[in-house]
Design a protein with these regions (language model features):
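Active-site neighborhood of HAD-like aspartate-dependent phosphohydrolases
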Residues: 1-51
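Metal-dependent phosphoesterase signature
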Residues: 15-34, 59-68, 82-83, 95, ...
Length: 183
């Protein structure tokens, strides 16, 4: 089997504008980040699978149901599909941060490893885009060598990323220069 490269995206703070300390609990509260459509289309054009990996402990806290989260993701996918930018896979960990026995919570590589197995992905030729240390650490733990950190207010950057951006507005431009070099 020939493995495909992929770009893994965190959701809140990367795909959509961060809700700050809160949660995106409804589709009306979900607002795409500037430049994300162009970035996703570019990944696809260059032959990279696009996969969403997101921690959504709002479900674990009882602030929303799994059904509501699924509906938000379905609406997101519909909007992305209209832009030829839909994700090929969505992986969400709904465990609480302190939940004992959770294997999917970032920085665990579980969501990435599951996506790689289910979609035939080459992690050595892949990239992670995230805004938290745990996103970058998850990529390192999964063996993904290339990472892009989107700097967002209030998220200290202590785990080194290979590239750091001030916002998603320049993500497509950055991906255009990086992706051809990691295949």
């Amino acid at each position: 089997m020939i493995l495909r490269p992929a770009v893994f995206f965190d959701r809140d703070g990367v795909v959509n504008i961060s809700p700050g300390a809160g949660y995106v609990l409804t589709w009306d509260a979900f607002h795409f980040s500037p430049g994300i459509f162009e970035a996703l289309r570019l990944c696809k054009k260059l032959g990279f699978a696009t996969v969403l990996v997101t921690s959504q402990q709002g479900v674990g806290k009882g602030l929303m149901t799994q059904t509501t989260l699924d509906q938000i993701h379905a609406e997101m996918q519909r909007a992305l599909a209209q832009e030829n930018a839909a994700f090929e896979g969505i992986y969400a960990c709904t465990c609480l941060a302190e939940e004992p026995g959770c294997k999917c919570r970032k920085p665990s590589p579980e969501m990435i490893l599951r996506a790689a197995e289910e979609h035939g992905l080459d992690l050595n030729a892949s990239l992670m885009v995230g805004d938290y240390d745990r996103d970058i650490q998850m990529a390192h733990n999964a063996g993904i060598p290339t990472t892009i950190r989107i700097l967002t207010e209030g998220h200290p950057a202590t785990v080194p990323a290979t590239h750091t951006l001030s916002g998603t507005e320049i993500l497509a431009e950055t991906l255009r220069s990086i992706l051809p070099t990691i295949r």
